[in-house]
């Protein structure tokens, strides 16, 4: 089967790109043809189709919205990419002609940078489209279902004007206006309704999309896969620390974690690992009190064997999200390495963790409840091993890449068969 994968980043930016890299390589090894369509940023992975990629809407060195200088020219490019881009359609058409014989398109994260106009191009070429939705971009101007730092669902059913009223995009009136206008235009054009199937990682996400007007029959739950990239080292063993790994950004609730850790003041260390966004790491460091300064650490971004070692040797990992986190991959990666998880009871997270079996849950944004649950975990270290073992068994039984790819290919085949009957 020949599959075109569409994603705005074709380099390791986060969980979506890790998934993209893994699934493309796995399917290629199984004899399928995988073709990327993306944006040409500095550091983009090599590809024979790179000449067909879109030019960046801003600086090629700056892939993230928070780092882009909004000159008048850049604003116009983002307006084009956020609404309906003919440039994207032309580039994709050229790629499809060069890669003659595409069977299906798999769209991941294209929001604001690539334009959903490419869905029209696939339809013009009679190519069915499957789209993976891993956040709330189609329901919320800010993508996070957060307003003033708290969960918000005002726009879910299409009342996007709230995003302008509350300046939900970067607290910026112009940016919010562009985003809200784009959402109304795309809803009017029905672009996302043309998608043949939608893949989501959890029931919570599916329910939110249905609430927002998407077809229940088209929406399929397919959990994120994990694959052990590195064999565990025999010298690794559990050490006296707790770990968070992932994005260091406001919606991840790390200020609540620091609050609880300092009040509990356990004789252990806390490591917060990842890239910082919008200056969040510096804001968090400013919250650390003198008595905890030597026990709360920020090692920066880690990957590969280094990250695997951090996860495998932790007593447990923490996911303190305050937003409706759909199905954080960090939970499954912790399980994969025999590490139980303490996470907030919000979004799709309760679907991932079986309480007292593979981890524990606490009330989001509740420092007091996190103190209680963290204290329980630290006081029951004998049970942590059992939880880690149970999580590892669950992942190895149901969530490896081979199982995920088999279910994904079955969906692709069903979509193609249905499409050819029309």
Enumerate the language-model features and the residues they cover:
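Carbohydrate-associated surface elements
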Residues: 204, 225
